[in-house]
């Protein structure tokens, strides 16, 4: 009989979808095993027969499915206002590029966010965060990028820090100052990039407000040369990088980010084979964002077969934002990734667990159920993982465990 220490907690009578690639079964499924949690981490996974059937801190889950906590590795959670009017314009025929050129798009949200009080931004973001937590999300990336000036970018990152301090969900904050050219720099995008590189990145990094630097390399964002300046600045300071690339056109952004060993290349609808090869060589995760593809009514799909062939890890994220993916649901993103992009259910699950963890640099501690990993997991009223993906309007969450505590 396995000896338990005081304070150990056990989940038994469960189906474990470990998402551990070392296990041969789909989803890393194992039956007749129990999960032992100690001090916020998974201590061990052991046969049921090694443990008592009942006792203090032993939870009988009556055969329910247990998976790692979900990870949303790409969100723009902190913002004010909405862009419903722009969506109506698009329904009437206007393009995303046209709306952006007219001062809409990202800059419309920038104006609303700059004017919004920090406490109001916090309350708005907290409600969104709790919606994701209610779906089983235990690790969440939050980007800045709706300030486009030092003071407001810092304000957004402070909100992310305040959310993290609640200890309800892990937050991975990202500086996305190179999101768009603000109105005051409309005729001088290079000057704005200088501000980002010489002021925003070093000052906000020194304050410990973010974990990685992101950028938008696109015709409506920044060109390759401007993007590389951002990457060079970040890497000189030892900051991990990532990029929004190849969403609306092929500029070579994925190759660029991969040359700097980027954590991830996100969107990637127009990614070509050279870009896929570069991502493999750079250890860069491909992050699929089907919500934006759907909402913008795009037709160019990411090259999923190429990503498989080159064995590039593929993550899936909500891309929750007010302009192009107003979907605060990772379950929906998983379903969309399967229906629109052709992922299997198992690939979608890997995309919101172990591959999403890799996209945030957390692959050694998050995204799998195995010894020494964080005890972040979800108990579902389901028998098979596909059930969560299949019916996104229904939330079968039974219990969410964060750092070993039922939350």
UniProtKB/Swiss-Prot annotation:
Identify the enzyme class. Answer: hydrolase
Cellular component terms per the entry's GO annotation: cytoplasm
Major subcellular site: cytoplasm
Residue sites binding N-formimidoyl-L-glutamate per the record: 146, 321, 323
Compartmental location: Cytoplasm
Q: Is the keyword Phosphoprotein in the record? A: no
Cofactor needs: Zn(2+); Fe(3+)
Which reaction does this enzyme catalyse, per its entry?
Answer: 4-imidazolone-5-propanoate + H2O = N-formimidoyl-L-glutamate
Report residues binding 4-imidazolone-5-propanoate: 83, 146, 179, 247, 324
GO MF assignments? imidazolonepropionase activity; iron ion binding; zinc ion binding
Query: What Enzyme Commission number(s) appear in the record?
Result: 3.5.2.7
**Stretch forming the signal peptide:** none
Iron is among the record's keywords: yes
Binding annotation for Zn(2+): 74, 76, 244, 319
On the tree of life, the source organism's domain of life is Bacteria
Q: Which sites bind Fe(3+)?
A: 74, 76, 244, 319
Biological or metabolic pathway of the protein: Amino-acid degradation; L-histidine degradation into L-glutamate; N-formimidoyl-L-glutamate from L-histidine: step 3/3
Q: Which Pfam families match?
A: Amidohydro_1
- Per its database record, what is this protein's job? Catalyzes the hydrolytic cleavage of the carbon-nitrogen bond in imidazolone-5-propanoate to yield N-formimidoyl-L-glutamate. It is the third step in the universal histidine degradation pathway.
Task: Tell me which family the UniProt entry assigns to this protein.
Answer: Belongs to the metallo-dependent hydrolases superfamily. HutI family.
Q: What is this protein called?
A: Imidazolonepropionase
Record organism: Salmonella dublin (strain CT_02021853)
Instruction: Give the taxonomic lineage as stored in the record.
Output: Bacteria, Pseudomonadati, Pseudomonadota, Gammaproteobacteria, Enterobacterales
